Every structure is written in structure tokens, then in C-alpha cells.
Amino acid sequence: MHKINKRNLILFLIFLPFLSNKKILASQKKPNLVVIWKKKRVLALYNRDKLIKAYRIRLGFNPKGQKQKEGDGRTPEGKYFITHKNPYSKFFLSLGLNYPNQADKTRAAGKGNNPGSDIYIHGLGKKNIFLHYLFDWTNGCIAVTNKEIEEIYKKVDSGTVVYIYS
């Protein structure tokens, strides 16, 4: 067994606070909240009130306003949660949301509409990454690059709360 040199131990303890970068530590934490701002085209991962990382996103092809019905091309707004992870998505990887929630169902029913379903946070699959940065292209989902969804997929667990704001 090795004997610890006191001098080296003291030096290590003195410099430890400088070695532990807060950004590195924050990025290693599991997010307990996902916040999406449609207008800003941003998805942010939080652990408690600390930002872990933010990503540029693309939305449904008709992004303004609350999703009203199936096929309207809008991304829903409200409180959701991650229901499941799909490693076999045609968009590389995806995280399913509990859309429609009760508020969505009630709103759609009041207008005689089907609210739709299958809203995900997903990658590009085989879509062109350059087109991804030019315009909103999904049917209502939230899209990031394949590299980004791989990172998000590893960090975010089923049950994580997702807020989507206009």
C-alpha cells in the first residue's frame, strides 16, 4: 500500500476548488426539468433552478399559437412530461410527450376536433442538417440535431416535466 505524501495531499486540497469547474459539474447533473420557448426556438435542460444546457430547436411547420387539432402543424403549449424513450425512432432517437393532456383534449373537444397525438422531442434522422437550420419542418414535434438528441436522450429520464411556452 502506498503512503500518502502529506505535502502532495495538502497541495491537492488547496487546489481542489480550482479544479472543480462549476459548469462541468452542472453539465454532469441529471435534468429534472425541460423548458421549451417556441418563439426563441430554445430547449433548455435544468437541474432545479440551474441551467445545464440549452439547444436550438425547430418546431412544427405552422409554429405560431397553441396546437388546436391533428394535422395543424403546430407545436403544443403547456405542461407535459416524458412518457417514454424510443431508440428506434425514424428521427434517430426520440422522447415521447404525454400529448394530448387533459387540457388539450378538452380544448379540442370543445371545437369538435381531434387533438392529434405523437408529439416528440427528436433528432433529424436522415434529414439534411442544413435545412434543419433554415425553417420549421416537423408536424408539431420539437427537433434538434442527431448529436444533440443523443446527448438529451442520455440525460433526460422518463417522467421528467416539460414546459412548452409560446
What spans do the regions from the language model cover?
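Well-ordered beta-strand positions in beta-sheet-rich domains
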Residues: 33, 54-56, 79, 118, ...
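N-terminal export leaders
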Residues: 6-10
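Secretory targeting signals
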Residues: 1-4, 15
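A structural motif detector for short, solvent-exposed N-terminal "entry" segments of globular domains
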Residues: 27-63
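Hydrophobic h-region of N-terminal signal peptides that target proteins for export
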Residues: 13-22
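Short, solvent-exposed loop/turn elements at domain surfaces
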Residues: 43-45, 53, 64-67, 90-93, ...
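N-terminal post-signal-peptidase region of extra-cytosolic proteins
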Residues: 27-32, 59-83, 105-107, 146-147
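Exported/periplasmic cell-wall-interacting domains
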Residues: 29, 84-166
